[in-house]
From Swiss-Prot:
Upregulation: Transcriptionally regulated by IpsA.
Keyword set, alphabetical order: Cell inner membrane, Cell membrane, Cell wall biogenesis/degradation, Membrane, Transmembrane, Transmembrane helix
Name the UniProt record assigns to this protein: Probable cell wall biosynthesis protein LcpB
Composition skew (Low complexity), residue ranges: 43-53
GO cellular component, one term: plasma membrane
Source organism: Corynebacterium glutamicum (strain ATCC 13032 / DSM 20300 / JCM 1318 / BCRC 11384 / CCUG 27702 / LMG 3730 / NBRC 12168 / NCIMB 10025 / NRRL B-2784 / 534)
Keyword Ribosomal protein: no
Amino acid sequence: MDSPGQGEIARDSQGRPILDRYGRPVRVRPQPRQTPPTPRTPPVNETRVYQPRQTPPRQTPPRQTPPRQMPPRQTPPRQVPPQQQYQQPGQIGQVRPQPPVIAGDGGRRRKAISFKPRGCLGTIAGVLAVGLVLVFVVTLWADSKLNRVDATPATQVANTAGTNWLLVGSDSRQGLSDEDIERLGTGGDIGVGRTDTIMVLHMPRTGEPTLLSIPRDSYVNVPGWGMDKANAAFTVGGPELLTQTVEEATGLRIDHYAEIGMGGLANMVDAVGGVEMCPAEPMYDPLANLDIQAGCQEFDGAAALGYVRTRATALGDLDRVVRQREFFSALLSTATSPGTLLNPFRTFPMISNAVGTFTVGEGDHVWHLARLALAMRGGIVTETVPIASFADYDVGNVAIWDEAGAEALFSSMR
């Protein structure tokens, strides 16, 4: 008998049930009931007027449900057993400690970000190497540009303590153009140069250096020429005779020699951007092309050269040697300051101008000059040979030393 809802059993033409391959009767799927279609109302071609609802709005009271309080979740820290590491033979019982595991991270170990300084150190090493090579090349180039002269006399005094430099400022016009001569007020060519500045820098093994000024009109013995002004030795015998004259007059052995001319001094001042000086009184000297007021001010090359050359003051040459010491100390302080050395636009012009205008002894080099500059920058004691009187001789007006005071000063430097 057919079950309701499952369809009738299919039969063949003889009325026998049709079986599937498993021996089960095959049922005929019932046909779905056909629903008559709903008649469709044709659209009306008209516009309806919107009628708002006249129902008053529903008044809903606010919900007075208190906020739900959720207790904090108490999660115990996860206990992770220590990881056993492979042990080499002979290391039984030694367990390598493991880094702690942070609770809540699911036991996953985060890879720490490690800073590897190899690249940074390599860059720094490369920059330092390039800098050292550059310094080495510039040093050799500067040393090759120095003018050298034989300033060591054949006979020298006995060796004295420390190191002594003979520093000379000459009024040579060599290398100056007509425009430079007019700008600097140096006058025309005078032939063999004379020394406007004679100083001895004594650098002891310990303690501060001493910068000793020797007035150029000092009345001293010039070997082979007799008594004369100190600067006459340079005129008649050059650096070698001047060195010998200073050694015999002071008893100090001269180890190094350095000389700079007018043009070189002015160019160095301009290269470092000027030097600040503080004259105590106004100064006017048309022969030195100088016209400055009292007070602190910045000198360019022309003003600086006139400042160290002029003798238009009350004490003449004695005032000048004091100004020369002050100026050279200020110049070296400016030239060796970080603002100059770290500025390539000042350092290279300064070196270029300095090496071309400096004259040094045969055995002197640019590194000796660098040590000289650093010694003077660190603080120095300034002295002038004591003068007893002035007198007129056949060589002109000269300065007579105070023999006792001069000897005491020289002895302190030997």
